[in-house]
A protein has these predicted regions:
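Short, basic, glycine/proline-bearing loop/turn elements
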Residues: 1-3, 119-125, 183-187, 259-261, ...
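Gly/serine-rich nucleotide phosphate-binding loop at the start of the catalytic core
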Residues: 1-164, 169-173
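Short hydrophobic-aromatic micro-motifs
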Residues: 26, 211-215, 258
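Short, flexible loop/turn elements at secondary-structure junctions
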Residues: 31-32, 156-158, 216-219, 293, ...
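Short, flexible loop segments at boundaries between secondary-structure elements
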Residues: 57-59, 181-194, 315-325
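Extended, H/D-rich, highly charged conserved domains that either
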Residues: 63-93, 100, 142-251
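Flexible internal linker/loop segments at domain or repeat junctions
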Residues: 231-273, 278-281
């Protein structure tokens, strides 16, 4: 067996044990949509700069090159101040709408071109959401007696939404209603059961259910006027091609990812609270996939969770950066950083194909491996790996008691 194949097998076995913990949370960043051609936005895109030139000069000076988030944050703050003074905000609204239109157009993964690095991938040629679907299928293979898995994403795009819909997975995303879907945070506490067949009246939890949180908002979220039936003034629209941002109906995005002093309002305060609650439960594991650790709010919550002895952090992000290197340098056995230079492990596509286990298949292989180890007692590498990981998990349980 080659060294790379052995390492992949060991990593899959380790990931399998973590997926079978009671509290499993995934944080998906921009890297999970990279292969679909969705942009990773840092600076104001060149195609948008002419429409934002005056605002950039006003807030940052001539020749400045601010981030998309910083510019949008300044526009929001200026809009708030002018509204308080009773001044016109038409010019600000027009720039904000143009920025959101650009985002809406370029983050629509139904229309983006598959990244050139994946032009030869036949799976993507047949189904652009193939890897999102496989990822979800594997995540839902966890035993049904465990708590629901949590999927958090910082992405505005609809890639996971489309994949969940295609698979027929019911996802609890904080909205209620059919024709008029409004944000109601209490929905996150709901679950889905169906009556059992026994005469004892027991109920059984439905399968194919996932808790889904879009921490920075979504292309499908629209800010509207509050009403008795929509207290928070947030609607979820169907992405059928008939909607685009307007001044009176702007899409909901949260651009202030680098501003820790920004006051979080609903729905973002609720989404961040849910994230903190999810990863600070005993025996929790957090998989950060395609997340570059550029959001200080999220990072603070993750760092706080590291104070819990039984918490495990798994990072899969192609190309290392200062923040991930800092975590790696801690040499904490609870922090697992997949090789950031190996695209077969640390990209979303590579992680789904080579690292994330198929729990059904792995269980069958484990049975076969155990049988072979009994027949040939001198060959025990897989069994030893299994024991090491079980011991690791047991040690964490003892530490948390």
């Amino acid at each position: 067996m080659s060294e790379n194949k052995k390492n992949s097998q060991e990593m899959r076995l380790k990931i399998k044990k973590y997926l079978e913990l009671d509290n499993v949370t995934v944080l998906a960043g921009a890297g999970t949509s990279f292969h679909l051609g969705a942009p990773i936005i840092r600076e104001v895109p060149e195609g948008l700069k002419p429409k934002c030139k005056d605002s950039i000069t006003e807030y940052f000076g001539d020749g400045a090159n601010p981030s998309y988030e910083d510019l949008f944050n300044c526009l929001q703050a200026d809009k708030f101040l002018k509204e308080k003074k009773g001044e016109s905000i038409d010019d600000i609204n027009s720039v904000m709408v143009e920025m959101q239109k650009w985002l809406f157009k370029n983050c629509d993964t139904q229309k983006t071109s598959i990244h050139s690095l994946y032009n030869d991938d036949s799976q993507l040629s047949n189904n652009r959401y193939h890897y999102h679907e496989v990822f979800i299928k594997k995540l839902l293979q966890r035993p049904n007696n465990l708590k629901r898995a949590n999927l958090f994403t910082t992405n505005y795009d609809m890639a996971f939404d489309y994949a969940l819909d295609k698979l027929g997975v019911h996802y609890i995303n904080g909205f209620m209603g059919i024709h008029n879907r409004c944000f109601r945070p209490e929905v996150y506490d709901y679950d889905i059961y169906y009556p059992g067949q026994s005469v004892s009246g027991k109920v059984h939890r439905a399968e194919k259910v996932l808790r889904y949180y879009k921490m920075h908002g979504s292309l499908s979220w629209v800010a509207t006027e509050s009403s008795p039936s929509n207290v928070y003034g947030i609607q979820e629209k169907t992405m059928d091609g008939s909607f685009e941002p307007q001044i009176d109906k702007q899409i909901m995005i949260y651009p202030c990812v680098s501003k820790k002093t920004f006051t979080l309002d609903l729905p973002y305060s609720e989404l961040f609270r849910q994230f903190a609650q999810a990863i600070t439960q005993p025996q929790s594991v957090l998989f950060c996939i395609g997340y570059s650790f550029f959001d200080e709010h999220i990072n603070d919550i993750i760092y706080q969770a590291l104070s819990i002895p039984s918490f495990t952090l798994v990072i899969a992000n192609f190309k290392i950066n200062e923040e991930i290197q800092k975590l790696k340098d801690l040499n904490d056995p609870r922090i697992i950083v997949l090789d950031p230079d190996d695209s077969e492990q640390s990209t979303f596509v590579g992680f789904v194909k080579n690292v994330m286990p198929d729990l059904y298949e792995e269980n069958e292989q484990l049975i076969v491996s155990e049988t072979m180890n009994k027949l040939y007692p001198t060959r025990q590498p897989v069994e030893d790996d299994k024991k090491d990981i079980i011991q690791d998990v047991n040690n964490k349980e003892n530490e948390s008691e």
